Every structure is written in C-alpha cells, then in structure tokens.
Amino acid sequence: MGCGNSTAASTTPGPAESAKDVQDDSSMDEEKRRNYGGVYVGIPADLTNETAGQTASTHKE
C-alpha cells in the first residue's frame, strides 16, 4: 500500500512543480525589471563596480 501511494504522489506533483517553476522564473524576472514609483528594483552591473571602488577607498584609509 505504501509504495502505491508514494508512486502516485511522486507522479502527480512532478508536472505541477515544473509548470510552477516556469511561472516563478517569469515572475522573478518581471519583479527584477519592475519600476516601483521611480525606484529601480534590481542590481545593475555598475553598482557592483561602485561598491568595489568604495571598498578599495575604505581599505586605503
């Protein structure tokens, strides 16, 4: 009995999870690109360079 339930349970959520993952990926991309009231949500590549520059300046002093 236990094996039958395990097999059925594993088969059912598989496809549902795959579809869910695809939707989540799209939603995440949209969330990153969205503009909330003029505030950009995301991490631009330039910001990484600025952070590195600030760290270097702080390290210098």
From Swiss-Prot:
Residues 1-13, 48-61 have a biased composition (Polar residues). Coiled coil: none annotated. Residues 18-34 have a biased composition (Basic and acidic residues). It holds the Pfam family OCC1. InterPro entries: OCC1. Residues 1-61 are annotated as: Disordered. It comes from the Eukaryota. PANTHER family: OVEREXPRESSED IN COLON CARCINOMA 1 PROTEIN. Belongs to the OCC1 family. This is Overexpressed in colon carcinoma 1 protein homolog. It comes from Danio rerio (Zebrafish).
